[in-house]
Every structure is written in C-alpha cells, then in structure tokens.
C-alpha cells in the first residue's frame, strides 16, 4: 500500500505474477520428483508450515525482511548455477532446462522486495536492525533446510 512509484508498482505486479507461475512450475516439478521416489511431500509440507508460522507470528516488516534475504540467497545460487556449467553437467536434459529456467527466473526479480523495503521502511530507525534480523532468521532456517532436504533426497536416490 505504501508503494506509489508507478515503475515499482509495475515491478511488484510482475514479481507477484512471476511468483504465481513459479509456484505452478514447482508443483509440476515436485509431482514429477515425487513419482521418482523423492520425499517431496513431507519437505513441501514443512516449508508451507514454516511460512504460515512466519505470517502468523511476525510483523509484515519481518516477513518482507525474510523475503529479501531468501530472494538474495536464491539469486546467489541462481547466479552460480548459470555461471558454472559443471553444476548441471551429466544431468537429465529436461531437468537441466528446468533448473536453468528457474535460475533465470530467480535473477529477474531479485531486487524487487528490497526496493519495496526501501520505500516501506524509509526513515524508520529500526529499518536496518529489522532487515539484519530477517537475514539472521532466514539464514538459520533456510540453510539447515537446504542441507536436510539435500540429505533426504540423496538418501532416497539410493
């Protein structure tokens, strides 16, 4: 509601649309991976629960701060995937295309949440501390989940 700049509003609308498409693609991908025997349903349920808890118990500024951090993490991973062809080397061609699309999609909107943050938190003394706390929160939740989910999928792939 605080965003009045037409260009930023347009970017936010594009971000929301892209995230909706992203969600649909994730559902199709997860379905295919689940059919291959991966424990996707349990992992997806856990992420959904965590996001709902964040919404329930965190102010909107913290939710936005966590979003900024998560978008930053995924953009870093996407940049690495796109820059180093060894990462997808030997992968199924269809899966490699999906992951490349996913990486491109992540890099397209990586700054939108931060741009909204700058508008929403402009001049507020707690802005930096809140953003830093969001980064810490996202870090201690996201990276252990990435490691756990990787481990679970490697185990299931035996």
Enumerate the predicted regions with their spans:
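Non-heme di-metal
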Residues: 1-158
């Amino acid at each position: 509601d605080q965003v009045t700049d037409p260009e930023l509003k347009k970017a936010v609308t594009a971000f929301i649309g892209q995230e909706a498409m992203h969600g649909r693609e994730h559902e199709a991908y997860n379905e295919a991976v689940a059919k291959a025997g991966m424990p996707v349903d349990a992992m997806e349920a856990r992420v959904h629960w965590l996001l709902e808890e964040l919404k329930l118990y965190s102010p909107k500024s913290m939710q936005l701060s966590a979003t900024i951090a998560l978008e930053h993490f995924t953009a870093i991973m996407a940049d690495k995937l796109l820059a180093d062809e060894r990462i997808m080397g030997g992968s199924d061609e269809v899966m490699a295309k999906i992951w490349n699309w996913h990486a491109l999609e992540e890099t397209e909107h990586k700054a939108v949440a931060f741009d909204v943050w700058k508008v929403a938190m402009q001049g507020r003394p707690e802005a930096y501390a809140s953003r830093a706390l969001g980064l810490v929160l996202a870090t201690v939740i996201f990276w252990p989940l990435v490691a756990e989910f990787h481990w679970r999928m490697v185990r299931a792939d035996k």
